[in-house]
Amino acid sequence: MPAIEVGRVCIKTAGREAGKVCVIVDILDKNFVIVDGLVKRRRCNIKHLEPTEKKVDIPKGASTEEVKLALDAAGLLKEE
């Protein structure tokens, strides 16, 4: 199980959105990813993410609506 992959559900550990649930939407390079979900869609350092065991099925570069639907289907949307 790769820790950093598209669709991996993570918890942000730094910044104003610390403690919120997010999903990796795209991988930019070895240090940065694009996250979306219960946080604003933005670039994030992987050192500021704590990957969970959960993974949602989304395509690379999925829209915010697709991410929210996948989180809702997985029952993770209410974790705030």
UniProtKB/Swiss-Prot annotation:
Coiled coil: none
InterPro entries recorded: KOW, Rib_uL2_dom2, Ribosomal_eL14, Ribosomal_eL14_arc, Ribosomal_eL14_KOW, Translation_prot_SH3-like_sf
Domain of life: Archaea
Keyword set, alphabetical order: Ribonucleoprotein, Ribosomal protein
GO molecular function, one term: RNA binding
Pfam families the record matches: KOW
Family under the similarity heading: Belongs to the eukaryotic ribosomal protein eL14 family.
Protein name per Swiss-Prot or TrEMBL: Large ribosomal subunit protein eL14
Gene source species: Methanocaldococcus jannaschii (strain ATCC 43067 / DSM 2661 / JAL-1 / JCM 10045 / NBRC 100440)
Lineage: Archaea, Methanobacteriati, Methanobacteriota, Methanomada group, Methanococci
Protein's gene: rpl14e
